[in-house]
Amino acid sequence: MERIIEKAIYASRWLMFPVYVGLSFGFILLTLKFFQQIVFIIPDILAMSESGLVLVVLSLIDIALVGGLLVMVMFLGYENFISKMDIQDNEKRLGWMGTMDVNSIKNKVASSIVAISSVHLLRLFMEAEKILDDKIMLCVIIHLTFVLSAFGMAYIDKMSKKKHVLH
């Protein structure tokens, strides 16, 4: 009976597969939004101010960072929780695939969130005259919370690896 339960629990990991497929659809939508922004900016590019262009570029960077985060979560989640990806051509296999554990994934996600938050904060600062000080302060506090969380997670991971080596 125990063996059947263990097999059922182990097989249930495949329930995550539709989640990763859904994330790939989210990535497609994000890609469409990226190119939509480029297409809509082209007619206005010559009349646009430098700061306006920087804001558009920051939006594109933001989308690229979120897209990278999605790809990382899809690939690493699939490889760590469902099945190893069988990519025959090692030259096409991404260098980090198959080498990251769950803690490494969490640290990568946390640093990606900090990068995304940094872009949002920079965009906010560029439009600071239009935004209430309270909102800016709240965004800075949220960003600092992300930064401290990322540092905390990295520190805990480092300590747990060091402790594991000592034992």
From Swiss-Prot:
Q: Does the keyword Transmembrane apply?
A: yes
Task: Check the record and name the NCBIfam families matching this protein.
Answer: HI0507
- This chain belongs to the protein called UPF0114 protein in repA1-repA2 intergenic region
Q: Does the keyword S-adenosyl-L-methionine apply?
A: no
Q: Which residues cross the membrane?
A: 15-35, 53-73, 136-156
Q: Which GO terms describe its cellular component?
A: plasma membrane
The way it spans or sits in the membrane comes to: Multi-pass membrane protein
Organism this protein belongs to: Buchnera aphidicola subsp. Diuraphis noxia
Its subcellular locations are:
Cell membrane
Q: Which HAMAP family match?
A: UPF0114 (MF_00143)
Cite the entry's keywords alphabetically: Cell membrane, Membrane, Plasmid, Transmembrane, Transmembrane helix
| Similarity field | Belongs to the UPF0114 family.
Q: State the InterPro entries in the record.
A: UPF0114, UPF0114_bac
